[in-house]
């Protein structure tokens, strides 16, 4: 277009392309830049791995967590869900992660459910590792964030699904 002297058309095309890329890069918007960055990065990772995700997110611009704590909370729980979902996907050809992240009654609710290949033993709200492979270490960091803000965390698992709910 530019070679043929169609600068305005080239500029318009470039602008539309840039807008399209920006929309793709920010598929999830919670009105909180750090939450958006983590969620969009994990969302792209799930898409690349062909893991389905069902999201329910709200406006989080008012949450008062330190940025580092947001990253610890979201990254650890989402990484665990993605890692286990990859295993399930290899075995069954299908994996769906359910994610809820909203403010309700002035509290942040973060709930995640993901499929599992086998039941994970949970004792005193921590994962009991059978293999000694540091399984569940990230959840200790999550628990530290939960404790720092005086919140609650509940973990549960059956033969098909792992659930984590954090309320801050």
Feature locations, PLM:
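Glycine-rich ATP-binding loops of the HATPase_c
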Residues: 150-160
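Conserved ATP-binding N-box helix of the HATPase_c
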Residues: 67-91
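Conserved short strand/loop->alpha-helix "switch" segment adjacent to the catalytic nucleotide/phosphoryl-transfer site
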Residues: 27, 53-74, 130
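Short beta-to-alpha transition helix within the HATPase_c
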Residues: 15-19, 31-48
